[in-house]
């Protein structure tokens, strides 16, 4: 049983916008919330974990940092999440000597309230089903599947896993049908 601190480092925004239309302020928002926030949360947690003899950090990244998706132009979002993925690998090396593991889950399209932050409910109901065919395993992912991946990475069953970015994507990174 895990007997040390665990941080689920989950903060983000999502607002697809073409690269040529992203303002400096919008870009900064992606970096501040997705990357900078996770960087300093991980730093604060790691300091506390060192005092306790170890710990686990599981971050949320995104499939969009692994594979561009033309239907949702998201260069700023993707770049910030690519930073999270790089942070994961770097911290895995830096923190391993302190018995701190860090991993990231990279979900594809998961049906969460985030879509309601830039579309009204009618648009969400119309648009989300169009992504069902995007995943080789079928419909958009349920949040519970991402939660189960996070729970696994935080558990003792994953005690020898660190620095990993785990796609939770219904098979998207394997290829497209």
PLM feature spans:
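Residue(s) in the substrate-gating loop at a strand-loop-helix junction
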Residues: 62
């Amino acid at each position: 049983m895990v007997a040390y601190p665990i941080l689920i480092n989950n903060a983000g925004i999502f607002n697809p916008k073409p690269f040529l239309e992203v303002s400096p302020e919008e870009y900064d928002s992606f970096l501040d919330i997705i990357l900078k926030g996770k960087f300093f949360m991980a730093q604060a947690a790691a300091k506390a974990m060192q005092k306790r003899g170890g710990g686990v950090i599981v971050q949320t990244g995104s499939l969009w940092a692994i594979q561009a998706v033309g239907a949702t132009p998201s260069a700023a979002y993707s770049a910030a999440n690519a930073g999270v993925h790089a942070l994961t690998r770097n911290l895995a090396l830096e923190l391993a000597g302190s018995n701190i593991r860090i991993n990231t889950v990279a979900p594809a399209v998961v049906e969460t309230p985030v879509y309601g932050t830039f579309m009204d409910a009618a648009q969400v109901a119309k648009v989300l089903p169009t992504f069902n065919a995007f995943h080789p395993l079928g419909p958009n992912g349920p949040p519970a599947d991402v939660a189960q991946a996070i729970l696994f990475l935080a558990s003792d069953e994953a005690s020898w896993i660190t620095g990993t970015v785990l796609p939770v994507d219904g098979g998207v990174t394997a290829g497209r049908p």
